[in-house]
Each structure stands twice: as structure tokens, then as C-alpha cells.
């Protein structure tokens, strides 16, 4: 597994996968310092200096980046031909990845607000999966079930509605 992004989602998701037995090999971030901080929390990960992963041993590439960066990174990233490209956004459709050089596209959406210094039990975080191929579905469902007890398949339109409702509920609760 390789991560693109080192923000709040990556800060929690990468160690959860590492602890579940998925080796996180590389972390790329616009900020190499932030990538280095994340790799310190992982067993074998190294900082990656560019989006050229053509020689990577990873088979899963997770874009844990801002919504507006997904499409640009999907267009620029170079990954092995059969690799799976995943984004973690609740509001962006899987089609944001369509310009990538792979057909194995997926979304892994954790229904959770993440803060770097907040401890989270990932087993209780609901994960929602959407994929374009059977192979991506098989791999992503296995990955998701290894870190969460609540895994469901969901389409982009349903995921966006769920995300909007969750944001509304969270903001309403915070406002009270």
C-alpha cells in the first residue's frame, strides 16, 4: 500500500492498515516534512519525492487528499498497470479517478471525522466501498474488513448524501 497525502485521514488510516498486516511502503505529500512525520508512525514506509510510482511494489494507492486535488493527482500519478487507485472522499464520485492509467478504481470512505491527535478505534469506524472492477472490489472489501467491523458497498450518489447528512449532524451537534 502507498499513500498520497499525509493529512488527518492518512494519519489514522495508514497505521490502521499497517497494524492489520498491510505493509505501507511509501508516503507522498506536497510537504515532505509531513510525509516524514507519517512514515515515523509506520513500520517500513519511506517518503516518496514524486508521483511516479511506476517501480513501486505496492498494488494499492490511496489518495487521502483534499477533494479538489483528487482529479489532478489521478491524472498525474504513475502507478503499475494492474494497481488499484483509491480515494477516500465522501463527497466526490468515483469518476474523479477516471483519467488514471488504471481501470481498477475504488473509493474507501470512512464515516468519521479525523483529527491527528485524537485516538480512534478503527474497528468501530464504518467504511463504505465503491469499485469499478471485481478485482478492486475483492481487494478493497478484504482490506476494509481487516480494519473495520462495519463495511458496506455504496454508490457515489448514496455516499454523497450520507456524507452531507453526516457533516450536517456533526456541525449541528458542534453548534449546540
Annotate the PLM regions.
Residues 22-23, 103, 149:
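Short phosphate-binding/catalytic loops that engage adenosine nucleotides
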Residues 2-3, 63, 129:
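Hydrophobic Val/Ile/Leu positions in short beta-strands of Rossmann-like dinucleotide-binding domains
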Residues 32, 42, 46-119, 140:
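Rossmann-like NAD(P)(H) cofactor-binding subdomain of soluble oxidoreductases
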Residues 1-48:
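NAD(P)+-binding Rossmann beta1-loop-alpha1 motif at the extreme N-terminus of oxidoreductases
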Residues 34, 38-41, 119-164, 169-176:
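Internal alpha-helical scaffold of NAD(P)-dependent oxidoreductase catalytic cores
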Amino acid at each position: 500500500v502507498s499513500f498520497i497525502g499525509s493529512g488527518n485521514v492518512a494519519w489514522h488510516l495508514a497505521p490502521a492498515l499497517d497494524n492489520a498486516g498491510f505493509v505501507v511502503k511509501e508516503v507522498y505529500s506536497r510537504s515532505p516534512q509531513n510525509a516524514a512525520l507519517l512514515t515515523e508512525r509506520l513500520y517500513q514506509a519511506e517518503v516518496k519525492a514524486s508521483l511516479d510510482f511506476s517501480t513501486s511494489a505496492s498494488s494499492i494507492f490511496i489518495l487521502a487528499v483534499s477533494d479538489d486535488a483528487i482529479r489532478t493527482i489521478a491524472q498525474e500519478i504513475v502507478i503499475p498497470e494492474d494497481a488499484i487507485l483509491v480515494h477516500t472522499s465522501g463527497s466526490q464520485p468515483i469518476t474523479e479517478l477516471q483519467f488514471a492509467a488504471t481501470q481498477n478504481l475504488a473509493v474507501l470512505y470512512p464515516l468519521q471525522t479525523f483529527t491527528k491527535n485524537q485516538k480512534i478505534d478503527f474497528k468501530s469506524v464504518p467504511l463504505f466501498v465503491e469499485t469499478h472492477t471485481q478485482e478492486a472490489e475483492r481487494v478493497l472489501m478484504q482490506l476494509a474488513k481487516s480494519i473495520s467491523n462495519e463495511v458496506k458497498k455504496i454508490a457515489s450518489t448514496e455516499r454523497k448524501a450520507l456524507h452531507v447528512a453526516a457533516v450536517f449532524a456533526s456541525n449541528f451537534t458542534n453548534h449546540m
